[in-house]
Amino acid sequence: ASDAAKRLADIGFGVVTSVQGRGTLPEDHKATLGAYNIYQPVEDFYKTCDAILVVGSRLRSNETLNYKLKLPSPHYQVDVDLDVLNRPYKPDMLVLGDSQLVMEALADKLDGRLNTDKEFIVDLQSARKKAIEYLRDGFKPYKPLVDAIQATGGADFIWVRDVTVSNSTWGNRSVLLNRPYDGVHAMGGGIGQSVQMAIGAAIAAPDRKVVCLVGDGGLQVNIGEMATAIQEGVNICVILMNSKDYEVIKNIQDNSFGGRKYFADLYTPDFEAHAESVGWSYQMFNNLSCVKSKFSSVLKSGGLKLLEVDMKAIGPYARAFGGPPVRQPKTRKKG
């Protein structure tokens, strides 16, 4: 339904997507908020909007602060499933139908008739800019890596991500996507699915670059798929963010259990030796000073590449990720 979504954006709608809906509208389009739905500047922007049209989204807890995100009202929804009326966000009006057909019909009705406030896009862009700045501040010192992926990949790569702290911190939002199928992610939350998804993407689109983001825990779950990739003769660049532990578990233990640590330290194999044993080329990054030039040369050369980022050497994220964000209840002042 990307063509219909673009028509609505061109006549005055703003667009925000779920993580799985990224690329429905090119993320450099002036009218998109990207997937920055959960950030305070975007919620503040929502307060100025007259209505919201939700198309095909389940408005998942992970992307709505556990259903506490305040959406514009009235809330109109387009879906093929009547059960949407039984979900936490109940629409004021539901249209049962195909998203492309309904949005095309809506665009036909509104084209030339929609009179949007001139400040609407200005305010939307301001909200997005503030959300991006907040997110980028949180993933220091890994900004050079994120910028290198964007700069060298351009609009011509498929971005496959495992469930890992690095993806939750920046991979889900910071690398721009321009087409509906440019992003591949395991929405269910289980680690260890990325390499096989990357193999599938590379087989489906052999002329495009496939970049895969994975953590050390996730790669150990599907490490045998590296041999499968050789057998299938595909071109994949895997970025391995190696923290040598279950980082998110430790962060949750810090947040919720007073910092006591159990069952979160992880034995990690020699990934270089494993890569060489199955025929992958390998590079280690224990600093990010030259990451842009090195990453560019890797993408140009093709083949199967494993790029290991030593997170112990580079350091932790400025803002720790301890699970999907939720809105904490306000505490009453004792009188």
Locations of the language-model features?
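Active-site glycine- and acidic-residue-rich loops that bind
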Residues: A1, G138-Y142, G218-V221
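Glycine-rich, anion-gripping cofactor-binding loops and their flanking helix/strand elements
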Residues: A1-Y76, L176-D207, N222-I223, N255, ...
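Active-site diphosphate/adenylate-binding microenvironment
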Residues: L8, Q125-V195, A201-A202
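Short, well-ordered beta-to-alpha junction loops that form the rim of enzyme active sites
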Residues: S18, D162-S166, V309-K312
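Cofactor-binding loop segments of dinucleotide-utilizing enzymes, especially the Rossmann-like FAD-
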Residues: S18-Q20, S57, V78-V80, D98, ...
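Thiamine diphosphate
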Residues: Y46, N86-P88, L94-L96, Q100-E104, ...
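Structural motif
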Residues: A51, I158, K209-V211
